[in-house]
């Protein structure tokens, strides 16, 4: 931080301004929003916004697990058939009733939105047929038994058929198609800036706490902190790790920290072709991709001192990750609780693989997308350089980054994965399964990792209704992936918010930031 920004922050600490009126809430959030079309992209920021306007058929919360959403009840009527009872009092903001027709339409649309680069298709991969039995009854038939169907469709937000069937993403962004049925109603959207909303008095659920909500995008962590301290916003998310200690000492601020599910993960490229981002020490292209050799991947994995990164880079705002799920979650394998740091063995593995002198590698990372990702990448680069792999970090805008990552252009990419379903198969489906767009598998498998044993485990877990048996399958999958170093997990973010002291902030689901998690202290 520069001397000027430090002085500005100090001044803000002293001159913390007054808050907004009690009935209004102003949130400063970090995750960019690609659109307010709730079915365009499976992005964290888009999810957070959508939950204000478009409930799912089943609700998922960090506290309490699954809960009724638009469906009041659901059950298996056969191993491959689910029946959902839809609320009879849910209405859209234009006064028309919410029916099973809207839900059936939404599941079709969510798989085919033009311009999507992060499809929701994986959540519906097991679905063979969706039928409307009557206005309040939806029947979903799956291709095979799928115990995770309710939790998967909790991530797909329902839009109105009578508006959505002719609406484009631009129509949602402009407000033309924003006929909603959530706790808040749409007021306006300024791309790259903010979303304005108001309480929806026709909402079927619990009455919203706030009359009006201003949801403001502030990408820079220091700027978010300054906005809170100056009174421009009432709450911020993803608090800068460097600001936590200062804020905790400020009586005019309350810091809220909870364990998180989101992992920062490195994805090696499994492209068999040589990469321009991997060369010998003289800058000449190699004749093959060294990352295809598991000995090289193991060397990279064991060279990283994750504890040092957690302490020195993240300043305690993360917990070390040794697999994609954190400890004490469904599918975590305690046999892989630690990755020993061993640079000497790493060098020996490189020599054994035919790279005694190492090589050069460029790692790509998006700027201002995942908190501390560029700084973390630089730290990883130092650890790898020490074992002979001279690593350069290239930070690029996310819009550019995601295009290259999706095409597997990069030798090493970085992804922040939310594990939003709270169990291990979500990551298996999206970032580990062999890429198959038609089946909705591997949508975010940017490195194009492919392991038949992992794919087999995913299929078995997806068809197993017995929880202990399903968890055992996921734990076995952890062994498969981590022994093979299909990914290189670094850490799990803690979910950290800061607010005015008269507000209470509780976790919602995954690391989402929504107005519904904020209340006035009684």
Question: Where do the model's predicted regions map?
Answer:
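N-terminal lobe/hinge region of extracytoplasmic solute-binding protein
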Residues: 28-78, 108, 115, 177-180
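Extracytoplasmic/periplasmic ligand-capture domains
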Residues: 59-62, 75, 83, 87-118, ...
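Glycine-rich and polybasic anion-binding loops at the starts of cofactor/ligand-binding domains
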Residues: 490
